[in-house]
A protein has these predicted regions:
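Helical "substrate-binding/catalytic lid" subdomain
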Residues: 84-206
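Short, conserved loop/helix-junction motifs that constitute active-site signature segments
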Residues: 1-5
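Rossmann-fold dinucleotide-binding core
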Residues: 8, 14-94
Length: 206
């Protein structure tokens, strides 16, 4: 096998609970080091070396790999375990997906009452709900530009993993459950490769 003692396996993919446990167990069985380091940031962020890694693994391993990770990152956040890295990545994506769904609803309500999108977005700017995400997605959603920065199919995948995390904890999460349903509808219409902000189209077509 390619993996074994003196080898290191780094996972950057956003995977589910079960896959994370599998990777931890398999690397332990083969004797190789394992670092789970999913990240937040886009292709542009990677090119600008401004990703943020959630690094879950042995402390000494993270320190050894830090120079490698820093080539594409502004921050390496050490977290308690590989599983914690997965959970943190998924639950931050939960906020991202839910925020865009809420923004789609807000834009649609304003449009229905004759208030222009730019007026609504300007009203958000000084409000506590303002965020980098809203600044990024709001204008493009208003224009109907769904060029992919993070695809609907990928966010839908992550949303299913989020629901699995909630189920394992015995929690009901109606907010992300509804957003998942809306993403599934768009995906079923063949829009999976568009940006996940295409959630707005559920209102634009009515």
């Amino acid at each position: 096998p390619l993996l074994g003692p003196a080898k290191t396996f780094i996972n950057h993919a956003t995977v589910d609970y079960e896959t994370t446990e599998y990777l931890v167990a398999e690397c332990a069985r083969m004797g190789c080091a394992f670092l789970n380091a999913p990240f937040t940031g886009s292709k542009v962020a990677a090119g600008n070396a401004s990703l943020v890694y959630y690094a879950g693994g042995d402390k000494e391993l993270i320190e050894r790999l830090q120079p490698f990770l820093e080539t594409t990152a502004t921050q390496i956040m050490r977290v308690p375990s590989p599983l914690a890295a997965t959970i943190l990545k998924l639950t931050t994506n939960l906020i991202t997906a839910s925020t865009v769904q809420a923004l789609a609803e807000g834009l649609s309500i304003n449009a229905a009452h004759g208030i222009p999108a730019d007026t609504y977005l300007s009203a958000i700017e000084p409000n506590a709900c303002a965020s980098t995400l809203v600044q990024m997605k709001g204008p493009s959603m208003a224009k109907g530009d769904y060029s992919p920065h993070f695809s609907l199919s990928n966010m839908l995948k992550d949303a299913r993993y989020m629901l699995d995390l909630a189920r394992r904890a015995g929690l009901k999460t109606p907010g992300i459950a509804n957003t998942t349903d809306q993403m599934q509808k768009r995906n079923d219409l063949g829009e999976g490769e568009s940006d996940f902000s295409i959630l707005y189209r559920q209102f634009k077509q009515k």
